[in-house]
């Protein structure tokens, strides 16, 4: 599985070597029996942007023992880099699920393992996240079915059950609870702004869009006083300029509260 396929509309040469390494890392661990299913999202979901990470969803046949979990997370850390810190590596986000935990679909579903750069300091300190219920899998699997390339096996829309709209909306409602006051988004302002625009898009359309596409959609629907916040976040995401959202705390909070209110109108509290 470590040889990444190339075909029209699939994985770019730019990330193929890194993807091959990540898949090899997963295969190397004897406790992991990959069920022939791996999907990559960010590389095709609107194309790679300057600070885009690589989102990989892998289905395995069996649960991980603790030794395998620790070894895998340590090795994945070596195949990833924080955005902008490496000329050759992008940040990777790996979500690993056990086949029988998500097929047939049930909500909320369980994830076996997740790796991302935000975990680096914890992993270095010997703190390893266990398997857990993850409401976000409803969103992640919807994204995979709409915007992904299968590295091994059939397409995601053939492999995964559709996520019912009521489960998607429940996951969107729960996600909104993450952001209630300024400490909740401090240091992550741009991502929170862009994520809220995506949630708003999904709440209205029932579909998933790339961050910049959702931002364009949302800007057209925002009152004029809130548009500069989202425009600044979008331009920074595209590498066109740096954002200074952290210095605009009041405007940022007003934007977040407005968009959350619009989302709640669509999906309920």
Swiss-Prot record:
<keyword id="KW-0547">Nucleotide-binding</keyword>
<dbReference type="GO" id="GO:0046677">
    <property type="term" value="P:response to antibiotic"/>
</dbReference>
<protein>
    <recommendedName>
        <fullName>Aminoglycoside (3'') (9) adenylyltransferase</fullName>
        <ecNumber>2.7.7.47</ecNumber>
    </recommendedName>
</protein>
<keyword id="KW-0548">Nucleotidyltransferase</keyword>
<dbReference type="InterPro" id="IPR043519">
    <property type="entry name" value="NT_sf"/>
</dbReference>
<dbReference type="Pfam" id="PF13427">
    <property type="entry name" value="AadA_C"/>
</dbReference>
<keyword id="KW-0808">Transferase</keyword>
<dbReference type="GO" id="GO:0005524">
    <property type="term" value="F:ATP binding"/>
</dbReference>
<dbReference type="GO" id="GO:0009012">
    <property type="term" value="F:aminoglycoside 3''-adenylyltransferase activity"/>
</dbReference>
<comment type="function">
    <text>Mediates bacterial resistance to the antibiotic spectinomycin and probably also to streptomycin.</text>
</comment>
<dbReference type="InterPro" id="IPR025184">
    <property type="entry name" value="AadA_C"/>
</dbReference>
<keyword id="KW-0046">Antibiotic resistance</keyword>
<keyword id="KW-0614">Plasmid</keyword>
<keyword id="KW-0067">ATP-binding</keyword>
């Amino acid at each position: 599985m470590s040889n990444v396929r190339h075909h029209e509309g699939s994985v770019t040469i730019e990330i193929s070597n890194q993807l091959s390494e990540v898949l090899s890392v997963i295969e190397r661990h004897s406790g992991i029996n990959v069920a022939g299913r791996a999907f990559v999202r960010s590389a095709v979901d609107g194309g790679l942007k300057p600070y885009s990470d690589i989102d990989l969803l892998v289905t395995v046949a069996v649960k991980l023992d603790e030794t395998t979990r620790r070894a895998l997370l340590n090795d994945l850390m070596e195949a990833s880099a924080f955005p902008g810190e490496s000329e050759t590596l992008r940040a990777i986000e790996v979500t690993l699920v056990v086949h029988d935990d998500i097929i047939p679909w049930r909500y909320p579903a369980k994830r076996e393992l997740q790796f991302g750069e935000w975990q680096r300091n914890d992993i270095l300190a010997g703190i390893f996240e266990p398997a857990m219920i993850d409401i976000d899998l409803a969103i992640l699997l919807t994204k995979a079915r709409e915007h992904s390339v299968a590295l091994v096996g059939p397409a995601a829309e053939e492999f995964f059950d559709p996520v019912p709209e009521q489960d998607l909306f429940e996951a969107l409602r729960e996600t909104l609870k993450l952001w209630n006051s300024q400490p909740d988004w401090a240091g992550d302002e741009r991502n929170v702004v862009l994520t809220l625009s995506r949630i708003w898009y999904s709440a209205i359309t029932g579909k998933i869009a790339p961050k910049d596409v959702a931002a364009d959609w949302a800007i057209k629907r925002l009152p004029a006083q809130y548009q500069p916040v989202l425009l600044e976040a979008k331009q920074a995401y595209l590498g066109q300029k740096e954002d200074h959202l952290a210095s605009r705390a009041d405007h940022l909070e007003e934007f977040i509260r407005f968009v959350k209110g619009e989302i709640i109108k669509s999906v309920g509290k």
